[in-house]
């Protein structure tokens, strides 16, 4: 779980899970093209955008969420930007599988018809499930449909995040 806004993440210790990021625009464009294809569609219809290990996504986040460097000579900052390290909580897969979340933070959610305890339990369950899923490869999407459209270029996660975070503190 990566929180770019607050420069922090929760990762499963010992697992550098592959994450697949596909923009809604790319998904729509692929579906439009695929509908017009001749022939038989594959039984499994994976559409896979950019695939990166979590460690690389965190590096991109640290780069994009950097801070202006004001003391170039002392810090050795030649590009005018310093990376801003993310705080990374590592949790054990065994703890997660036993329903224990040991991270220093969690997701936040609220709803006027749901009590705080119910929300907390639901958010914890979703976060644990997401982390277990990542460690077990659930976010490494297959690419059967990609192979039918070899000329299609998916949005790269770094380009997408750079656009989203440009000019934001």
Where are these predicted regions, by residue range?
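Terminal hydrophobic/aromatic helix or amphipathic segment near a protein terminus
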Residues: 58-137
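Amphipathic terminal alpha-helices
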Residues: 142-169
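Hydrophobic residues in alpha-helical segments
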Residues: 34-35, 134, 164
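Oxidoreductase cofactor-interface core, primarily capturing Rossmann-like NAD(P)-dependent enzymes
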Residues: 1-70, 74-87
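Short coil/turn linker and secondary-structure boundary residues
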Residues: 22, 52, 91, 114, ...
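Tryptophan-centric aromatic hotspots in well-structured domains and transmembrane helices
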Residues: 21, 125-126, 160
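Surface-exposed beta-strand-to-loop junctions
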Residues: 7-10, 138-142
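Short, surface-exposed beta-strand/loop "edge" segments at domain boundaries and coil↔beta transitions
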Residues: 17-18, 136-138
């Amino acid at each position: 779980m990566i929180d770019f806004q607050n420069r922090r993440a929760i990762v499963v210790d010992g697992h550098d899970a592959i994450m697949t990021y596909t923009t809604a625009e790319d998904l729509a464009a692929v579906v439009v093209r695929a509908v017009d294809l001749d022939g038989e569609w594959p039984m499994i219809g994976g559409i896979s955008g950019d695939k990166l290990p979590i460690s690389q996504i965190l590096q991109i986040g640290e780069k994009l969420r950097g801070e202006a460097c004001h003391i170039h000579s002392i810090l050795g900052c030649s590009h005018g930007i310093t990376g801003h390290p993310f705080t990374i909580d590592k949790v054990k897969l065994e703890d997660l599988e036993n329903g224990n979340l040991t991270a220093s933070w969690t997701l936040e959610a609220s709803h006027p018809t749901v009590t705080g305890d119910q929300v907390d339990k639901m958010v914890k369950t979703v976060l644990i499930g997401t982390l277990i899923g990542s460690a077990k490869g659930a976010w490494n999407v297959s690419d059967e449909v990609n192979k039918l459209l070899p000329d299609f270029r998916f949005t790269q996660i770094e380009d997408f995040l750079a656009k989203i975070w440009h000019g934001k503190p």
